[in-house]
Amino acid sequence: STGKPLAYLGLDLASTDDMTALAICTGDAENGWGIRMHYFLPEMAIKRRLAKDESSIYSDLKDLKNVTVTPGNVTDYNTIRRLISGHYVVDGKVEYDKDNLSEKYRIKGVAYDRWNSLNLIRDLEGDGVTCDPYGQGFASMSFPSKEYAKAIWTNKLHHGGDPVLRWMMGNVVLRTDPSGNIKPDKGKSGDKIDGVV
């Protein structure tokens, strides 16, 4: 319905055994952006990370409301679908959960990286969610990266103090091409930046 706030979603799907980030963006450039994040990762990813570094932010993830930890070694993409569209599969049967983003927002679209997303995106589109592929090269990432930085500098980006997003922002290293275009560099960044991407 039109009474729902408009939202833009961004989905950075990790490899199945790592952190996936879903950004829920509301607002506009003039008045400011509200960003709510939701993260998904498998339980074994947390255990592996804590085995290397007990003091890492991973020690607090299970206690955060905006983190879904799925059992086992791989992220269950069914949980991502359930949060976005409400649809999910149990024992081969599609179920519906009313507590989902499509019920709360008019979702303009889900921008996603084409890598490793085919089945989930096909399912979301089948659920009636518009999904738009989004490249992670300089041509696609430079303008939004500059706008993101501008929103931060002008205090028009509000994330409610999300500790995971704050940590990821601190990890970002930008790469610049000869034309002055910029983009986050996952390879050179100190740690996870999925929520920023």
Regions found by a protein language model. Name each.
Residues 145-154:
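Short, surface-exposed amphipathic charged segments that create phosphate/polyanion-binding patches used
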